[in-house]
Amino acid sequence: MAKKSMIARDVKRKKIVERYAAKRAALMAAFDAAKDPMQRLEIHRKIQALPRNSAPTRIRNRCWATGKPRGVYRDFGLCRNQLRERAHKGELPGVVKSSW
């Protein structure tokens, strides 16, 4: 189980990303459309002035059952250990053990 403070930090980051998503997208669109280097520099400074945690790349995928940050399967939102346990128990519909 991951530390509760780390899970809380990730939840906080998700909220901040949602709050600044529209502003960040507008600035990025303006940055891409700008041709003048000075104008691009000014827009880049505005993007840098946004909070660091407002960037979507700062969010870490975590297992929803244990909070572990590594080995998380996107399709299920579970870490590899939980995926294996729940698949063996039959709690994941459509998941079967492979055999060939």
UniProtKB/Swiss-Prot annotation:
Cited InterPro entries: Ribosomal_uS14 (IPR001209), Ribosomal_uS14_bac/plastid (IPR023036), Ribosomal_uS14_CS (IPR018271)
GO molecular function: rRNA binding; structural constituent of ribosome
Keyword annotations from UniProtKB, A to Z: Ribonucleoprotein, Ribosomal protein, RNA-binding, rRNA-binding
Single GO BP term: translation
Cellular component, GO annotation: cytoplasm; small ribosomal subunit
PROSITE patterns in the cross-refs: RIBOSOMAL_S14
Gene3D superfamilies in UniProt: 1.10.287.1480
HAMAP family found in the cross-reference section: Ribosomal_uS14_1
Oligomeric form and interacting partners: Part of the 30S ribosomal subunit. Contacts proteins S3 and S10.
Role noted for this protein: Binds 16S rRNA, required for the assembly of 30S particles and may also be responsible for determining the conformation of the 16S rRNA at the A site.
Family as reported in the entry's similarity comment: Belongs to the universal ribosomal protein uS14 family.
Full protein name: Small ribosomal subunit protein uS14
